[in-house]
From Swiss-Prot:
<protein>
    <recommendedName>
        <fullName>Sugar fermentation stimulation protein homolog</fullName>
    </recommendedName>
</protein>
<dbReference type="InterPro" id="IPR041465">
    <property type="entry name" value="SfsA_N"/>
</dbReference>
<dbReference type="InterPro" id="IPR040452">
    <property type="entry name" value="SfsA_C"/>
</dbReference>
<dbReference type="InterPro" id="IPR005224">
    <property type="entry name" value="SfsA"/>
</dbReference>
<dbReference type="Pfam" id="PF17746">
    <property type="entry name" value="SfsA_N"/>
</dbReference>
<comment type="similarity">
    <text>Belongs to the SfsA family.</text>
</comment>
<dbReference type="Pfam" id="PF03749">
    <property type="entry name" value="SfsA"/>
</dbReference>
<dbReference type="GO" id="GO:0003677">
    <property type="term" value="F:DNA binding"/>
</dbReference>
């Protein structure tokens, strides 16, 4: 049985996505009332944010926070099992928005999850490639950048890990990024410098959807990132794309995905 690494807080609600605006705001219909939630995902969330789609929101732990909800999960790929429990969502023709037939699933879109997930999974000893490391520092500055994870151990070089959230899948291939990412490109360049200095560097891709069977960079979306991805891999940067199992209770670590060839 897989161990749950991250649990969602009590008080989560499921509603219907209405719209996204000003990049960080989403409107969601919950119990017949439209609420405003925060999304920290700066990507496009390509193919996910369709009007009427079920979404899961988590409540703010700080009662004084301006926006009391955070977008955590988006349903995709098929009919939601408790469709009749959600508020009806009229479409432009006046009917109710239909959903795809087939088996649907949740997609995790909270971009704060990957580095938190990595730290907890590391502390639980779930990554064979981190054997020999005992200390996990987060948000460590190096050069002009700040990387998610820096691992330390006795007699081993430091291991720097940058964590990325993956929500895009095409033809069973999980792809990153889902929009041009200059920040992601900068991180790859920083990882290359780390390798050149004699330390270890890796990327942890948190694939938060079940239909990704392989992993690769999104060449059609960000060719610069893709070129740098293959360059740093050849240089020695380690690539670890992991499938993350998702339920409305929480997240657990699945298998590592095969990497497509260049």
């Amino acid at each position: 049985m897989e161990k749950t690494i991250i649990y969602f807080p009590k008080g989560c609600v499921i509603g219907r996505f209405v719209k996204r605006y000003k990049r960080f705001f989403v409107n969601v219909l919950v119990d017949g009332e439209e609420v405003v939630a925060h999304t920290n995902n700066t990507g496009s969330m390509l193919g996910l944010l369709n009007s009427g789609t079920p979404v899961l929101l988590s409540p703010a732990l700080n009662p004084t926070r301006k926006l009391q909800w955070t977008l955590e999960l988006v349903w995709t790929g098929g009919t939601y099992p408790d469709e009749n429990k959600l508020p009806s969502f009229p479409n432009k023709e006046g009917g109710v928005t239909p959903f795809h037939s087939g088996l649907g699933f949740w997609v995790g879109v909270n971009t704060l999850i990957p580095h938190k997930f990595f730290k907890l999974a590391f502390e639980a000893g779930l990554f064979p490639w981190t054997k020999g490391y005992s200390i996990c520092n987060t948000e460590t500055k190096i050069g002009m950048s700040r990387l998610d994870i820096c691992l330390h151990g006795n007699g081993v070089p430091r291991l720097w890990v940058e964590c990325k959230n993956v929500t895009l899948v095409e033809n069973n291939v999980a792809l990153f990024p889902d929009a041009v990412s200059l920040r992601g490109l900068k991180h790859l360049q920083e990882l290359k410098k780390i390798i050149d200095s004699g330390e270890r560097a890796a990327t942890f891709y948190c694939v938060q959807r079940k239909d990704g069977k392989f992993f690769g960079p999104a060449a059609s979306i960000d060719p610069q990132y893709t070129e740098m991805f293959w360059k740093v891999k050849k240089r020695g940067v380690e690539i670890y794309p992991y499938h993350i199992d998702i339920t409305t209770k929480g997240l657990s670590l699945g298998p590592i995905l095969p990497l497509l060839s260049e």
